Amino acid sequence: MTTDSYLLTVTEVIEETEDARSIVFEVPPELTDTFAYVPGQFLTVAVPSERTGLVARCYSLSSTPHSGRHQITVKRTVDGYASNWLHANLRAGDTLRVLPPSGIFSPKDLDDDFLLFAGGSGITPVMSIARSALEKGSGQVVLFYANRDERSVIFAGALQELAARYADRLVVVHWLESVQGLPSAAQLKAFAAHFTTYTAFVCGPAPFMKAVTDSLKELDFPRARRHQEKFVSLGGNPFGEVEEVLAAQAVLDEVDDGDEEGDEPGAAVVTGPVTVEVELDGEQHTFDDWAGDKPLLEFLEDKGLDAPFSCREGQCSACACMVLEGEVTMRNNEVLDAEDLADGIRLACQSMPASEKLRITYSG
């Protein structure tokens, strides 16, 4: 199963740095509700590909919901097909296929005090959170922003303007590897030690996030006030059999010898019927007929529930839920770490029942 995708027109392309550009989409009035989002969420974009028709990539929204703007920011990477294509080919007036906003890297209360850590292009969702907190919240915002050098600082001008406008609420600390070297665990811990009552959000390269997260743990930041976003490249196709994919498949079918067999679906630990209680959007639902023949996400969709998701491949955290009672097994997991799993967090798109009764919440 897939969700509906939409062709959106690019209204503006902004060159932020030599390697980063922001892309602004026009969302028609009839899709306003469909593309409503909260700070920290992302869009899944279909980037054209001659081989497969498209490749799916998730890019964080760097704009704010209250601005009415839908802007993603893409940093070009050396071996990144999608980012290089978007930098080399995309212009204002072009269209891209896009899925509605998704993701759980979002603050629950904009009035909180925030400690934000961003490394490189990890600033994109963090910028949305910072702007939203400053413009719609009432707390303090502290941003630690690490980059290779001064020329690689995305949103340098915008951050300077925000710091001037909110001088009594915003502190921005720039850390440049070319000047100060990589931030050490001790330096990160010493910095965070001044803000142990704040809610922390971390996004950037994996080593940076690990160093920050380890520092926060040592300072006894509770899990509820520690959030991190991992950037991944999706390997599957969440867009379904759209025109671009069918056209590419037709070309492949011409040379397919037809001898290959598809993979057998993995067997569920429990074949049902399984009883599952689900809390979603503040409402309780109980079902007693999960046969264990499909993942939790698909089962809930069959029941008419609007459960969150994006990639369906276990490569993003959009469908994350918390298992309060019972057990599930995941067919694939590329984003949840050991601490997530210990806390009961699971990916609904990959979760198969491993007990006869389950209690699950999406409000964790």
Predicted region positions:
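Ferredoxin-reductase
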Residues: 2-95, 147-149, 160, 177
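FNR/FR-type flavoprotein reductase catalytic core
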Residues: 84-265, 275-277
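Local cysteine-cluster metal-coordination motifs and their immediate loop/turn environment
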Residues: 125, 301, 305-330, 340-355
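Redox cofactor-anchoring modules in respiratory/redox and cofactor-processing assemblies
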Residues: 228-302, 318-323, 351-364
